[in-house]
């Protein structure tokens, strides 16, 4: 795995050097838009709706809207913002493990010890023994995150999972649920029996993404066979040459007599006959 961040966890007076790695990866089959008629890939260009010209990345800015008014900020403007130390994970507080609402949980990362393992093991064991998690602040890709730091797995691996800020979570507003019906004992009993019948230890490996499996099968069924062009006549000649036993060349005088040329048994062989012989033996 390739580290996405390197820094340290500040745990009181203890500094825990770590490297951060993405804990998840996607295995979805990637695709792109194409023209149905000829299979050509679809390309997009950034075009200004005011002047109609194509805009290069270096000329892009961001417009923010507040109370109906807009402000255009450039990369230089954003660079002036004060930023937190992007090499430190600051522990804010420790809370009981069950108090963090799962709806707040976002992207997970693994932390590996960088350098000495002792401070890493100390923090991991402390969290595990106390059955608590650490609420931390960390800056990733120039953006500050609130995150939870906890211990996972039999090797007590520190796992950091970013949290959504409270204002990013919507309140459920479902008036229909304000007046729930009374449930009978019989209904509750049957429902409880069904839960007991379907109860089992959670094993994610026994579940599979059926859509992904069927999509791959569909794609493979439409793959065009790759044709490898080859010179059939040339290949046949090479095969015949490989299996045909090589015959010894006949003596030039024997060959010449077989061809009807008149030459002496000991005299010099004319050059034109030598040339014909060599051409025939090539």
Curated annotation (Swiss-Prot):
Alphabetized GO MF terms: acyltransferase activity; double-stranded DNA binding
Pfam families reported in the protein's UniProt record: Ku, Lsr2_DNA-bd
Keyword vocabulary terms for this entry: DNA end degradation evasion by virus, DNA-binding, Host-virus interaction, Inhibition of host innate immune response by virus, Viral genome circularization, Viral immunoevasion, Virus entry into host cell
SUPFAM superfamilies noted in UniProt: SPOC domain-like (SSF100939)
Span of domain Ku: 9-189
GO biological process, one term: symbiont-mediated suppression of host innate immune response
SMART domains according to UniProt: Ku78
Function: Required for replication of viruses with short cos ends (4 bases). Stimulates dsDNA end-joining by host LigD; in conjunction with M.smegmatis or M.tuberculosis LigD can reconstitute NHEJ in S.cerevisiae. Binds dsDNA with either blunt, 5'- or 3-overhangs, protecting it from host exonuclease degradation.
Subunit record text: Homodimer. Interacts with host LigD, maybe via the LigD Pol domain.
Protein name: Protein Ku
Native species: Mycobacterium phage Omega
Organism placement in taxonomy: Viruses, Duplodnaviria, Heunggongvirae, Uroviricota, Caudoviricetes
Name of the gene encoding the protein in the UniProt record: 206
């Amino acid at each position: 795995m390739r580290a996405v961040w390197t820094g340290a966890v500040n745990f009181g007076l203890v500094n825990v050097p770590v490297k951060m790695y993405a804990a998840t990866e996607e295995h979805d089959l990637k695709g792109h838009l194409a023209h149905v008629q000829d299979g050509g890939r679809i390309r997009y260009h950034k075009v200004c709706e005011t002047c109609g010209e194509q805009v290069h990345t270096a000329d892009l800015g961001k417009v923010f809207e507040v109370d109906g008014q807009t402000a255009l900020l450039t990369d230089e403007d954003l660079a002036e913002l004060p930023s937190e130390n992007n090499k430190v994970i600051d522990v804010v507080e420790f809370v009981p493990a069950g108090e963090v609402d799962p709806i707040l949980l976002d992207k997970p990362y693994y932390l590996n010890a960088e350098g000495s393992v002792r401070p890493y093991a100390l923090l991991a064991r402390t969290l595990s023994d106390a059955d608590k998690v650490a609420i931390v602040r960390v800056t990733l890709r120039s953006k500050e995150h609130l995150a939870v730091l906890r211990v996972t797995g039999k090797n007590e691996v520190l796992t950091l999972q970013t949290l959504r800020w409270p204002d990013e979570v919507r309140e459920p507003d479902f008036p229909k649920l304000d007046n729930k019906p009374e449930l009978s004992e019989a209904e509750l009993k049957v429902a409880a029996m069904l839960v007991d019948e379907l109860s089992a230890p959670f094993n994610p490996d026994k579940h599979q993404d059926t859509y992904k499996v069927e999509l791959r099968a569909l794609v493979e069924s439409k793959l065009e066979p790759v044709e490898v062009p080859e010179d059939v006549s040339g290949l046949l000649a090479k095969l015949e040459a490989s299996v045909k036993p090589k015959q010894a060349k006949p003596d030039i005088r024997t060959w010449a007599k077989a061809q009807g040329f008149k030459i002496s048994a000991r005299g010099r062989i004319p050059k034109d006959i030598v040339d014909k012989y060599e051409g025939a033996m090539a």
